[in-house]
Amino acid sequence: MKNLITSIALLASVGGAMAQKTVLPEVKVRGQYNANPMQLQELSMDILVMGQTAVTTMEMTFYNPNDRVMEGEFEFPLSNGQEVSRFALDIDGKLREGVVVDKALGRQAFEDIARRNVDPGLLEKTEGNNFRARVYPMPAQGVRRILIAFEQELSQKDGRDFYFLPIASGVKLKHFKLRTEVVSRMVKADIENTLQLNFGQSRNSYISEVKKDNYTLDKNIGLTFPKIDKPQLLTASKGTDSYLYGNIALEKQSLREKEKPKRIGILWDCSSSSQKRDFAKEFALL
């Protein structure tokens, strides 16, 4: 396996267009006073970059430090251009996938299931590009797992394709994992203060993995890639999911005036069903 040493740009701060709100999710306590906040203990991230599209998956473990069962509210802010593609919540220790339904049907399902004191796992879009979901129960001194994935188009920076994920929140994690896979493209460092990673080539992808314990999220994630100037057709697999990506630039078409016809043919209905028509007006039009 050919090893390539490159960098993921983990930025402490960036200005101008890169100044974005933190997208790190959190679980807030609902309806309880004098309660300790929920703690994000573990974060496992998977970033798949294919062509001009990036899919980011975040699996989180939240801990309830209180000595009683709590109700939490999962809040997840996204930046403009990012769209949720997956949501899952653990039920009886296993992640259960959410589904997209009509708003009215989703609210009815939420109320019906909530009456049974079971968490329906309904992800709701609020103002802007923010999302939230009820998390109940949060067991006393226990944990709940939440998974969310979102897609985005790569942005442009200095003539190169750019991926940016602002997660610098200062949260200290017990365990942190980051896996990055870039399909058929070299990835390069672009900003100082970067974490050096070893990318290994596997078939048509470049893959990097990092694991850290007692890690503080004090920097953001940024990746830059050479601009794609030729057509691409790519495939990739993630578990049981397969992805197909095509990037084809269309040639600019020049406009020209359409040539006027020299003769025009007209079909005129003179059957018995046309007896009540005004033939004089039709002949005048012709």
Predicted regions and their residues:
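Conserved hydrophobic/aromatic pocket- or pore-lining residues that grip, position, or stack substrates
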Residues: 223, 246, 269
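Solvent-exposed loop/turn segments at secondary-structure junctions
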Residues: 105, 252-253, 270-274
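Catalytic P-loop NTP-binding/switch module of NTPases
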Residues: 242-253
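Subset of Sec-pathway N-terminal targeting signals
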Residues: 20-241
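…and closely analogous acidic/polar surface helices at protein-protein or active-site interfaces
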Residues: 258-267, 272-286
